[in-house]
């Protein structure tokens, strides 16, 4: 009987298998009536109650369900690098342009001259911060629920900095020479699509717009760009799904891109769906094509002074505080002429 009780208890605890009535004896009765009390029913001293505290019947799942946030993809599209330090306010780039002309030769002629023009375009940094604080009692209370509150607050501060860095990479900082990948004033104006990709069922028509934006980059490149150039195309995840539309001939845009532009890779950027994206009324889509040419170095880079600086922990009487900071230069386009875009 003892062995059966052990086995059934393990089945219930580990596997949720319950055998009711495994003990045939009724525990509320005794062996003989003489062992039972026949006293009169007493009155209650306590408040009448037929239940128990709800906490005894509440099961708390130990796994913490983290709320998901939109991914940060700007650094993947533009590339990312560190420039300067957290005390750097301005960054200057050295830009050299070769100039020259020729004339007909003459033994005593000094006509025509070759020269070089040196320029120093600049960008300004922007530094931002967030603070975290922990109380002794709040941490202890959270620990009763098996929640590591201190760790979650640290992760929140890191995420806040990462999200803002991504925002700065896309839109820059208003009032500073600090531009984003979508609004740098030196970028060529975007072209408009010929149709709404979400409403179009013919993949050949969608590929026609893809071809147009590649041709725009080729035209701007003035011979530096061709169909074999290494491209990165940024678009929203919803817009990318239009490339999977297939007709009765098993033709889709993804296959045509691989065939015609073998070095083109797609990076999805959620923020490129403007006002809900092209799939909703009033929404638009932004598509950006970046050409990288080996002889020209990098076309664009997202730059930061520091990804995150964790400042000293401040100890209070019964709490702690910590500041975290970071700095950004936004996105720097070294050769904006190699960037084409489509908006609509």
Regions found by a protein language model. Give the residues of each.
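Alpha-helical scaffold segments that mediate packing/assembly in large oligomeric complexes
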Residues: 129-212
């Amino acid at each position: 009987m003892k062995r059966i009780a052990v086995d059934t208890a393990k089945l219930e605890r580990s596997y949720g298998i319950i055998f009711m009535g495994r003990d045939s004896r009724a525990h509320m009765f005794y062996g003989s009536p003489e062992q039972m009390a026949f006293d009169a029913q007493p009155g209650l001293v306590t408040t009448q109650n037929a239940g128990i505290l709800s906490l005894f019947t509440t099961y708390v799942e130990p796994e913490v369900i983290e709320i998901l946030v939109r991914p940060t993809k700007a650094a993947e599209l533009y590339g990312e690098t560190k420039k300067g330090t957290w005390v750097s306010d301005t960054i200057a780039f050295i830009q050299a342009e070769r100039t020259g002309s020729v004339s007909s030769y003459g033994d005593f002629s000094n006509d025509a001259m070759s020269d070089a023009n040196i320029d120093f375009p600049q960008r300004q940094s922007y530094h931002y911060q967030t603070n975290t604080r922990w109380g002794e009692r709040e941490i202890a209370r959270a620990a009763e629920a098996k929640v590591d509150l201190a760790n979650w607050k640290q992760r929140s501060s890191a995420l806040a900095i990462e999200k803002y860095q991504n925002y700065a990479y896309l839109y820059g900082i208003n009032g500073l020479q600090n531009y984003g990948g979508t609004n740098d004033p030196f970028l060529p104006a975007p072209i408009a699509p010929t149709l709404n990709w979400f409403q179009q069922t013919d993949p050949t028509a969608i590929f026609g717009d893809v071809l147009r934006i590649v041709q725009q980059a080729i035209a701007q490149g003035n011979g530096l760009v061709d169909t074999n150039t290494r491209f990165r195309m940024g678009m929203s995840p919803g817009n990318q799904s239009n490339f999977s539309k297939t007709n009765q001939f098993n033709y889709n845009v993804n296959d045509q891109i691989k065939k015609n532009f073998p070095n083109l890779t797609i990076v999805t950027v959620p923020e490129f769906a403007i006002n809900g994206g092209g799939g909703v009324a009033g929404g638009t889509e932004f598509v950006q094509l970046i050409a990288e040419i080996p002889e020209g170095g990098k076309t664009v880079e997202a730059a930061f002074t520091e990804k995150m600086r964790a400042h000293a922990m401040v100890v209070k009487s019964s709490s702690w505080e910590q500041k975290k900071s970071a700095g950004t230069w936004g996105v720097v386009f070294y050769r904006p002429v190699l960037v084409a875009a489509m908006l609509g």
